[in-house]
């Protein structure tokens, strides 16, 4: 299973970037192999609807779970269609959020928690 | 390094005047204007521009006349009436690329469009990063991202421990871009019906970022009932009101003179502004 | 005659000028139309106690998927520049609120699985009283692309009327849509550096579009000539000055127009109109 965290850097020591659609990178961890790598979020360069482009990117990288701060309605719909589960946190290092996720301390989003454009 | 972003929801609440005061009280900080659609912090801080950069936003269509066969297909299919007589009106073009896809002669290309400029400047109170979006250009959220990224780099270079950003009005995409990753959001509001209306929405937006959120009521004595209403609302939203600035003609006078009100050095707002700044420093220090 | 009213900065008194100008022209031989194109916050109707005679919905086409025809080839996703379509796990998802209705997906779908279907984006309301018509556009909540609704309001323009168009603040796309093709633009500003800063942006926009303009200074104070100096420098006429007076603000806050609360303003607005007519004739 692959877990992605929206981040401002490329390692587990970097901070969570709470904006799903506009974060710089996703740090991805493969639960089975234990491997960690980062992908650039090219979705953030979109003129509009960056959340949808980002969801597509995560789908293409076969991500199963994404940990982020804010999810808008469009991004949520797209992630749902891609069968990617969303967990939300507010701040901390990528490794801390992964730890919280593994311990069951992050809440699973059942709907968008911000409006379009993050409003 | 700490980042403070000043936002307001509604425009015209005195956000920029308060930031101007903070710039002088902080002594030396990195100043950043995230209102790229209608920047106005420069009016108070009088920056001298040191470096200018171009900003390319969305792509727009361009016709290559040497390949165009005048078939008229693009003109017929363009929903925005942006193509007339083989010419593209870049103001009307929304960059949908339908023309690019349907052109049988491959005579249309999509080209990044120069949508604005951004600058690194010097002011008396520290370096400033600001921008100007071109006329009728979209994509201001992306430009705000660019400006803030540069602000962090410049602050690092100059060994500055604080970035103070002026956020755009509203609650749309550019506001979100100016809040992401900030340590503290200071919401400047006023005791009017629309001020009250916007407060709840903007506080909700800010609290989604896990930053410290606090409220300052500007011109609080214009309507004491509304002021109390705002204080109650803030309590309900669990955000502290850390400053109440009285209506002060000196604020308007300072704007007319193009200087921060603290430099003018008179009026009823001086002391409350100083106290507000102490509160901000205290909250930022505790983080 | 089509006159647009704009201001770089919000809250400068655009609607105050538009409503009083319209009321002052009621005795003119030509009919008067006031178009409220501030579709996100239409408020001109507050000042005219008129019953709405009719309302029309505004629709824009968005794609609809015929899942029997769809081959999930991804062409539409590739074509759409606005991320309004996503292909996930063999489902095609459409996002109506980011769609620009460009038609790319349905023109280019190889199996004709996408067809345009109308989506309501707003409404246009019309009220009439004698030879005066008020046309108001309202953007549907949850929609944020206002130019199509503005265009629908402007489609009601009558070439034989004096048309006054009140729009949103700023100098961005919606404002360009309201000033486009008008004979003259009245810019409403206030005498502060912030007002001037935004006035300059609005004037730059009008120059690009080649539209003649003049300035109304609202909340004018005699000791301040910041706007005067700019206008003199640019050769822009100052059409009217409305002084900074609490009576004006108070009456206006109650929903009473300037010419109604103080009838001596009526000849001044009439003069403003005649000045605009002369400027356009030049």
Residue ranges and their predicted role:
Chain A
Residues 69:
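Conserved residues at the C-terminal ends of beta-strands
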Residues 1-53, 60-61, 80-82, 89-119:
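Non-catalytic interface/targeting segments
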């Amino acid at each position: 299973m692959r877990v992605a965290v929206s981040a401002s850097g490329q390692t587990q020591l970097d901070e969570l970037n709470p904006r799903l659609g506009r974060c710089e990178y996703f740090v991805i961890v493969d639960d089975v192999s234990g491997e960690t790598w980062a992908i650039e979020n090219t979705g953030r360069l979109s003129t509009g609807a960056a959340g949808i482009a980002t969801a597509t990117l995560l789908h293409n990288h076969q991500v199963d779970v994404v940990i982020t701060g804010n999810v808008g309605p469009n991004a949520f719909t797209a992630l749902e269609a891609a069968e990617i589960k969303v967990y939300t946190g507010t701040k901390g290092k990528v490794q801390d959020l992964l730890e919280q996720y593994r311990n069951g301390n992050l809440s699973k989003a059942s709907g968008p928690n911000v409006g379009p454009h993050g409003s | 390094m700490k980042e403070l972003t000043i936002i307001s929801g509604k425009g015209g609440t005195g956000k920029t005047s308060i930031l101007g005061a903070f710039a002088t009280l902080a002594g030396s900080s990195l100043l950043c204007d995230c209102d790229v659609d209608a920047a106005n912090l420069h009016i108070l801080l009088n920056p001298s521009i040191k470096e200018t950069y171009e900003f390319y936003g969305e792509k727009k269509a361009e016709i290559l006349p040497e390949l165009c066969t005048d078939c008229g297909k693009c003109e017929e299919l363009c929903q925005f009436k942006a193509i007339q007589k083989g010419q593209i009106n870049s103001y009307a073009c929304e960059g949908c690329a339908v023309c690019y896809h349907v052109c049988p002669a491959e005579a249309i290309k999509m080209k990044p469009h120069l949508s604005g400029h951004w600058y690194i400047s010097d002011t008396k109170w520290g370096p400033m990063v600001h921008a100007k979006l071109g006329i009728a250009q979209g994509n201001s959220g992306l430009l705000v991202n660019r400006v803030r990224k540069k602000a962090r780099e410049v602050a690092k270079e100059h060994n500055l421990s604080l970035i103070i950003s002026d956020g755009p009005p509203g609650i749309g995409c550019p506001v979100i871009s100016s809040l992401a990753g900030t340590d503290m959001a200071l919401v400047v509001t006023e005791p009017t019906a629309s001020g009250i209306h916007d407060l709840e929405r903007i506080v909700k937006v800010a609290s989604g970022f896990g930053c410290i959120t606090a409220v300052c009521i500007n011109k609080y004595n214009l309507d004491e009932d509304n002021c109390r209403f705002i204080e109650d609302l803030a309590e309900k939203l669990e955000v502290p009101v850390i400053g109440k600035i009285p209506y002060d003609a000196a604020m308007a006078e300072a704007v007319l003179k193009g200087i921060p009100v603290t430099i003018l050095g008179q009026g009823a707002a001086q002391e409350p502004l100083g106290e507000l700044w102490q509160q901000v420093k205290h909250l930022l220090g505790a983080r | 005659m089509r006159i647009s009213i704009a201001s770089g900065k919000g809250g400068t008194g655009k609607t105050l000028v538009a409503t009083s100008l319209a009321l002052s022209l009621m005795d003119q031989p030509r009919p008067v139309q006031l178009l409220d194109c501030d579709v996100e916050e239409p408020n001109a109707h507050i000042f005219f106690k008129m019953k709405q005679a009719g309302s029309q919905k505004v629709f824009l086409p968005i794609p609809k998927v015929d899942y029997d025809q769809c081959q999930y080839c991804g062409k539409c996703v590739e074509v759409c520049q606005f991320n309004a379509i996503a292909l996930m796990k063999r489902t095609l998802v459409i996002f109506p609120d980011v769609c620009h209705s460009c038609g790319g997906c349905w023109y280019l779908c190889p199996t004709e699985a996408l067809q345009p279907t109308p989506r309501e984006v707003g409404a246009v309301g019309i009220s009439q009283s004698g030879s005066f018509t008020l046309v108001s556009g309202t953007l549907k909540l949850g929609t944020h692309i206002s130019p199509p609704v503005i265009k629908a309001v402007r489609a009601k323009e009558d070439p034989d009327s004096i048309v006054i168009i009140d729009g949103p603040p700023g100098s961005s796309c919606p404002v360009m849509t309201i000033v486009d093709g008008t004979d003259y633009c009245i810019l409403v500003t206030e005498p502060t550096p912030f007002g001037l800063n935004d006035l300059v942006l609005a004037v730059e926009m009008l120059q690009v579009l080649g539209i003649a303009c003049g300035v109304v200074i609202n909340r004018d104070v005699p000791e301040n000539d910041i706007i005067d100096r700019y206008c003199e420098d640019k050769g822009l006429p100052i059409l009217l000055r409305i002084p900074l007076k609490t009576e004006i603000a108070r009456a206006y806050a109650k929903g009473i127009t300037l010419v109604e609360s103080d009838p001596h303003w009526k000849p001044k607005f009439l003069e403003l109109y005649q000045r605009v007519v002369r400027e356009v004739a030049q």
